[in-house]
Amino acid sequence: MADENSSAYWERRAQRFADRGEGLAAVCSYGMPDFYNRAIQLTQRRALSRWLRFEPGARVLDVGCGVGRWSRLCAMRGANLTGIDVSPTMVGIAAQRSYHAGIADRCRFLVQDLVDLALPDRFDLVLGVTVLQHILAPARLERAVLRMAQHLAPRGRMLLLEAAPVKATRRCDSAIFAARQRCYYQQLFTDCGLRIRAITGVDPAPFRTWALPYLRRLPGGMHLATTTLVSALSLPFDLALAPWAVDQSWHALFVLEHAGGARA
């Protein structure tokens, strides 16, 4: 999800990539080798694994669910899952894949912009993976966080994984992406009535994030080969060091809960 005109962007991207393989190019990085996106997914899953736990029957909201990769994981673990996304194609594929996985009875998928979210439910877990980094307008970003806080049950937990480096940098920013400084998110969450329970690292190895702006300039074959090599070098470091090298991590997993009531 991103700013007001971005739903068309995500729909075009979904139509092009969502039904290819696992659909990672639709929700991670398109134009990159498959190994690159699989490495991203591995580091994300490693970071989420400690916190993505709940009782059977727990109500889980997956915002910006894409093709439903985290939605299916939650439903397979016994959650009653609601997934939302601005792309009708993404939502359709997520529903289709939940059916083929035999978990359709525990899943519902809705075409919905997070900024305008207004469901009658409150959720034990609200999950968002690389969603806020695509909401560029500050007012819409704050509204999105408030909407999630308002849908979180009183004793619920919120997991938000975003590009959030400790030091400010714009070298990877684009028309649909912003890597905001970590302290910006921390203040935003506090302002929206949330308490930060923990911050976990995701990808502290510097090779990929330092090299990415330059790798994109290489010719096609060289770009794919070099990106795969850099990802392969980064992955062991990311998986091994992420729990401890939090300040060095490009992405961060924020573990949040109510601090006594979110603003209306």
Q: Which residues make up each language-model segment?
A:
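Conserved class I S-adenosyl-L-methionine
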Residues: 1-54, 57-64
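A short glycine-rich, Lys/Arg-flanked "PGG" loop and its adjoining helix->strand segment in the class I
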Residues: 142-154
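A C-terminal cap/extension of S-adenosyl-L-methionine-dependent methyltransferases
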Residues: 203-264
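A conserved beta-strand element that flanks and buttresses the S-adenosyl-L-methionine
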Residues: 127
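Acceptor-substrate binding/catalytic loop of class I
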Residues: 135, 168-184
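Class I SAM-dependent methyltransferase SAM/SAH-binding core
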Residues: 69, 73-115
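Conserved beta-strand signature within the Rossmann-like core of class I S-adenosyl-L-methionine
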Residues: 155-162
